[in-house]
Amino acid sequence: MDLTYKRQNVYALADENELKAISDYAQGYKKFLDNGKTEREVVAESVEWIEKEGYKPYTLGDAITPGDKLYYNNRGKGLFILRAGSADIAKNGVRILVAHVDSPRLDLKQVPLFEKASLAYLKTHYYGGIKKYQWLTIPLAIHGVVALKDGTNVTVRVGEDENDPVFYITDLLPHLSQEQVTKTIADGFPAENLNLLVGGIPVKDDEKDAVKKGVLQILHDKYGVSEEDFISAELEAVPAVKAKDVGFDRAFVASYGHDDRVCTYPEITATLQTETEQTVLCILADKEEIGSEGNTGMQCVLINDILNEIARSYGVNPSVLREHSKCISADVTAGYDPAYASAFEEMNAGFVNCGVTMNKFTGSRGKSGSNDASAEYIGYLRGVLAKENVIWQTGELGRVDLGGGGTVAKFIANMNIDTVDMGVPVLSMHAPYELISKADIYTAHKAFSAFVK
């Protein structure tokens, strides 16, 4: 009997049928990525998807009965998908899956448009933790909405179609970079310089800000908006690139937004496709990258409101419901990268191709800001995954004292709900173009399916 713990390579153990299933699953995921590059787009895409599966809109206060398939759309930026089961929720609670649909990006400022040296720019304010230099000299698209004073929304999506223009942030040529290259990365790329180049043709017979006015005219002709309308807009600059297979063997997928859509997609497929008597609540949350704040983040009381509605409809004390519920915070982790091996402690790192990764805790340094899941809950999940023959691994987010990160797990756990982080290891996390293994997202689907059973 082998008493040691060893990671298993998913590809090495997969037969031909399993390899085909992994590849086919990734094809659907890549379409999901390309269609949804912002939190609003992911929610809209998901609503369209689940409505085809028979899910209906839910209004707070409505009764919920076993067999119902419902969703609650939170301001177009968050989504709660509910499968009301027949199991006794006073004993079993609710199976909760939570992923987030916001990703690091560049938001346009409220007064963004200016002209300098006959070039028109849009000023940005970065969202989430980025390395600013990675956003220079790459093609960028603009996605989002402009909310007009009459209450209507104008949808903007420029840079994705073959004939669309893209947008661009310049960098300094190496020949004149002697001063720039001596600075630290933090100081060498000021955030106020992350300005999108958006135009260069002046309107005729106008001397002042002629290029800026030309851009405004285009925006007015296409969208019916004026400069003032930027004040009530949510416009995001995101990479204008498609999800692509990586490697001669196509083992990987590179894309913008793997964090955290690589967990969003399998939590939805697990919710829709798994036969179960349990009541399942699948949550797509916003604002995780900036601390889960606001009324679309997981610090909002809305999750408690929905759990209370479930409890009321089933005639169960809400406190009892929460006590017996279980949650997976479906969020990515750092994949071990041999190019940067010193950032990791190899024995306790998540490896790509070795399955979905369970993080008992996250946080930073001395586990600060972490949800530290109990040994008993980890043991329970080990049994669940073993029963369904799911390949998975354990991991930490980098070596101790180097840094760290947080997830939504602690906010769910604060409600007296057993919660643990489980997600796909990512290489180049928070870069404009991240990398994941097709095998790992497939095992995430299998793990989440086992959990909701």
Map each language-model feature to its residues:
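N-terminal hydrophobic/helix-forming segments and targeting peptides
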Residues: M1-K453
